[in-house]
């Protein structure tokens, strides 16, 4: 195999004797110069962590090409949002449509009005019948540039006691995934009833398995595990 090596011109002009047993490296083994990651890449990678965090719904307050108002849409799935546990029967990969109406405010940031639409296969909390739980809900959030100088943390800052405000340092993006996840989960459990007639009636007890064995709704199984510890 033909092998080549690189020798510095400074080495040729010096008086240092080069050993005849010099190991030659093929060009394929020469490493390329690594480029520094951008701040956004660093945030996505968790500040240098080898595990990449996949973000789905993001907005940047420093995006310069947008002015005034604009709209954007995201098409994801319950599995993408890690909400497949909400599905009680059927495929756990229902589509989720997230529409964002964004307005830029001079020297402030972005105000975002979001709308979430999806359908989840659920069991009625009254009659236990399967039904499609239609989700059509909205949220509002402000994305503001952060003025803090704390560089120790590489993740965007969340707005303290106000969950409707997200502070983001220059060069970073606001991650709206958790906001969308919480909105869907709370809306799903808020009124888990299949019809108006069930809403006006009393809950019905259904026996599962042996009549002397208590059954636990899987939605509360995690609370039961914590109680037993």
UniProtKB/Swiss-Prot annotation:
Per its record, how is this protein called by name? Answer: Large ribosomal RNA subunit accumulation protein YCED homolog 2, chloroplastic
Keyword field: Chloroplast, Plastid, Ribosome biogenesis, Transit peptide
Task: Using the UniProt entry, state which stretch of residues is the transit peptide.
Answer: 1-42
Write down the InterPro entries for this protein, in alphabetical order. YceD (IPR003772), YceD_plant (IPR044985)
Q: Per the record's keyword annotation, is Nucleotide-binding included, yes or no?
A: no
Identify its protein family.
Belongs to the DUF177 domain family.
Gene Ontology annotations of biological process type:
ribosome biogenesis
Q: Which GO terms describe its cellular component?
A: chloroplast
**Cellular compartment(s):** Plastid, Chloroplast
Q: What is its main location?
A: plastid
Function per UniProt = May play a role in synthesis, processing and/or stability of 23S rRNA.
